Amino acid sequence: MKAESYSNPWLTSVLAWAMLALAAGAMAEELAHGFPSDFVARLATAQEIYVATQRKDGTHSEVVPVWFGLMDNAIWFTTSPESHKAKRLKRGSPLFVAVQGKDGPFVKTKVEVVQDGALADRLGEVYAQKYWIAWAGFFRPSRARNESGKTVLLKLTPVE
């Protein structure tokens, strides 16, 4: 007699999201070196971070929300190389990051602008695990967009 299998889509979804939450928590633990512990704890469950750059006159730019991923002991996201944000970062502006919302508190980070198609694909996979629309193939980093110059990767690490 053949055993029947039973699949519960709701339970499968809940278990998948629980595994993702555990993975995000483990990735956030990798960031513990250098970032404030409360900041790292909030990153584990955050859907977006809020970022601002510093203008030439020393004032901060508008605070904007961005999707992000955690990999290789850093916070990563993408932006257009033509954005004000990217231009300021290329000239050496620090990036100020908040997890709780536009009002902070903010953590100052060091930024590396990266052009690497393989890393873009890896970040796309991280996004796909975190954001359902990225999982469906939309709004996710990719080798093609990075190598064509449509996006740059931004790697955020603690200011030492």
Locate each region found by the language model:
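Short beta-strand segments
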Residues: 46-80, 95-98, 106-110
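Short N-terminal segments immediately surrounding and downstream of signal-peptide cleavage
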Residues: 30-50
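Short, structured beta-strand-loop surface elements
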Residues: 29-30, 82-160
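Bacterial N-terminal signal peptides
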Residues: 13-23
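Extracellular/periplasmic catalytic domains that process cell-envelope and extracellular macromolecules
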Residues: 42-44, 60-62, 69, 90, ...
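Sec/Tat signal peptide C-region and signal peptidase I cleavage site
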Residues: 24-28
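Bacterial N-terminal signal peptides that target proteins for export
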Residues: 2-15
